């Protein structure tokens, strides 16, 4: 979704807004600037601002690219005024480390954004909730009850079931092409849906198809670039004119209806007891538990389910498809990746088992390189400063929204040799990891706000990639060449390849 919200309004509305609001907001903007100068603060450098909109006019449909271009001129700590929101963008390893390690205490909150706020039932979740005692307790429950390594292992049945379906599709496809992008997204949806709602519910195709459409609409809501976020007073009016407000309400109502239906099904005393508890079962157990530090309601359950689906499907699926796209475009690299997987696992197996994935060291390199060049969320979920602090020698005031441009960090030539080249081998003898201690690579963030679903997400990514590389060799449809496969970034909160992967899978023949 474009950040340049005002361009979506008819010219006559812009004129009306300017006449009524320009004098007031101009006074506020310049008074704020004068106050900072009087205090002797050293704010980060940044581009000049316009009255009323600040720097919004300089951002388009790919804000992470716009931020990267501006940072080349203004540096790795850059200040922008997005409407009424003071904003800082960090674009280097050093500054991201300062934010998420050295200044984590002061800057680990979240801005109160309208889309995430509504979808999280007024910030009852873990991903978007501001820092507080409530958030700390909820995060403990979330990790211990739902995302611990013990729980991740429990959910292997869902991954294996969905992989068996994928194997059946790919084995029977030749000589016809398959839309692998679509199949990967369907597989991730099937895994997360089964883990969250259970086999019985997610096996209902009509329910699943409808829910998938609703989930796709929620991704637009989670984009922070809505007018109401930048203009607290008149932004809601602007969103109502553009239709964004009605769309947000419609999407929330739709997804809430699905969550309510699933919870009621799980509360039915006549429901057959499943072999393995799904996430809704676990959360309902917590609802009934009187010993928790706070009372868990249906809204808490729904907010956590939203985190599970939004964080579990798109980010994993785009990582898998980007990795496969890069390998497909480079046949020599694809051959090496397949040989490494097959050598580690051995011949003539129906599928790569979960316990075998850890033996495939080259898969780790592929995943890391994909996170570097194609972080699934190019602009990490924004931080929000609670106290005055300094980053990169500049003053960061309370109430500042702070973005980490993970995409820009992956293109830094001072850190990465030939950053435009996709080269998993760069990680062969490297200790750099993505679990929050190495700030060269932070696709999941770091510090208090590191993504709690890291283990579950990377487990699925490595498992699916290993199997796709192990079982089949791939041909391009007639008239297409591997080298000509386009890599075009598209999206909002998450960024995927605009071009779907259309390939002809051919079962690998062992010597």
UniProtKB/Swiss-Prot annotation:
Name of protein: 2-methylbutanal oxime monooxygenase
Record field: catalytic activity: (1E,2S)-2-methylbutanal oxime + reduced [NADPH--hemoprotein reductase] + O2 = 2-hydroxy-2-methylbutanenitrile + oxidized [NADPH--hemoprotein reductase] + 2 H2O + H(+); (E)-2-methylpropanal oxime + reduced [NADPH--hemoprotein reductase] + O2 = 2-hydroxy-2-methylpropanenitrile + oxidized [NADPH--hemoprotein reductase] + 2 H2O + H(+)
Localization of this protein: Microsome membrane
Keywords, ordered alphabetically: Endoplasmic reticulum, Heme, Iron, Membrane, Metal-binding, Microsome, Monooxygenase, Oxidoreductase, Transmembrane, Transmembrane helix
Keyword Transmembrane helix annotated: yes
Entry membrane topology: Multi-pass membrane protein
Protein family membership: Belongs to the cytochrome P450 family.
Entry cofactors: heme
Species of provenance: Manihot esculenta (Cassava)
Designated gene of the protein: CYP71E7
Function: Catalyzes the conversion of (E)-2-methylpropanal oxime (valox) to 2-hydroxy-2-methylpropanenitrile (acetone cyanohydrin) and of (E)-2-methylbutanal oxime (ilox) to 2-hydroxy-2-methylbutyronitrile. The reaction takes place in three steps. First, the oxime is isomerized to the (Z)- isomer, next the (Z)-isomer is dehydrated to the corresponding nitrile, followed by a C-hydroxylation of the nitrile. Can use both aliphatic and aromatic oximes as substrates.
Example of a GO MF term: oxidoreductase activity, acting on paired donors, with incorporation or reduction of molecular oxygen
């Amino acid at each position: 979704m474009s950040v340049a919200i005002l361009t979506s309004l008819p010219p006559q509305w812009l004129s009306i807004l300017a006449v009524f609001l320009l004098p007031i907001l101009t006074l506020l903007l310049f008074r704020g600037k004068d106050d900072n100068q009087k205090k002797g603060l050293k704010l980060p450098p940044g581009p000049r601002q316009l009255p009323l909109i600040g720097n919004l006019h300089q951002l388009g449909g790919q804000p992470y690219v716009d931020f990267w271009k501006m940072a080349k001129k203004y540096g790795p700590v850059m200040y922008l005024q997005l409407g009424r929101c003071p904003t800082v963008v960090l674009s280097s390893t050093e500054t991201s480390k300062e934010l998420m390690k050295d200044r984590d205490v002061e800057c680990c909150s979240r801005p109160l954004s309208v889309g995430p706020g509504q979808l999280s039932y007024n910030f009852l979740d873990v991903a978007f909730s501001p820092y507080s005692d409530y958030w700390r307790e909820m995060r403990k429950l979330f990790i211990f009850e739902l995302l611990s390594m013990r729980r991740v292992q429990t959910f292997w049945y869902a991954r294996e079931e969905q992989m068996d379906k994928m194997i059946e599709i790919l084995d029977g496809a030749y000589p016809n092409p398959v839309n692998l992008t679509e199949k990967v997204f369907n597989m991730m949806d099937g895994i997360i849906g089964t883990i969250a709602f259970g086999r019985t519910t997610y096996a209902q195709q009509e329910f699943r198809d409808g829910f998938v459409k609703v989930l796709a609409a929620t991704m637009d809501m989670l984009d922070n670039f809505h007018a109401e976020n930048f203009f607290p007073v008149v932004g809601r009016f602007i969103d109502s004119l553009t239709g964004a407000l009605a769309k947000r309400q419609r999407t929330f109502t739709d997804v809430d209806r699905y969550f309510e239906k699933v919870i009621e099904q799980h509360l039915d005393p006549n429901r057959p007891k499943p072999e393995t508890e799904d996430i809704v079962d676990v959360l309902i157990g917590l609802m009934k538990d009187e010993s928790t530090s706070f009372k868990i309601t249906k809204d808490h359950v729904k907010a956590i389910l939203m985190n599970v689906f939004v964080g579990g499907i798109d980010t994993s699926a785009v990582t898998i498809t980007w990795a496969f796209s890069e390998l497909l475009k480079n046949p020599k690299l694809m051959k090496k990746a397949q040989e490494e997987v097959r050598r580690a696992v051995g011949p003539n197996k129906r599928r790569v088992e979960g316990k075998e994935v850890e033996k495939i060291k080259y898969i780790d390199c592929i995943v890391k390189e994909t996170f570097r060049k194609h972080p699934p969320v190019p602009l990490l979920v924004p931080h929000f400063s609670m106290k005055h602090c300094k980053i990169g020698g500049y003053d960061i005031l309370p109430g500042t929204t702070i973005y980490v441009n993970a995409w820009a960090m992956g293109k830094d030539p001072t850190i990465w040799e030939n950053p435009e080249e996709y080269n998993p081998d760069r990680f062969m003898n490297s200790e750099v990891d993505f679990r929050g201690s190495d700030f060269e690579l932070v696709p999941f963030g770091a510090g208090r706000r590191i993504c709690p679903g890291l283990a579950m997400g990377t487990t699925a990514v490595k498992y699916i990639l290993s199997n796709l590389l192990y079982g089949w060799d791939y041909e391009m449809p007639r008239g297409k060449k591997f080298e000509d496969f386009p890599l075009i970034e598209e999206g909002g909160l998450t960024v995927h390849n605009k071009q779907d992967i259309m390939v002809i899978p051919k079962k690998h023949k062992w010597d």
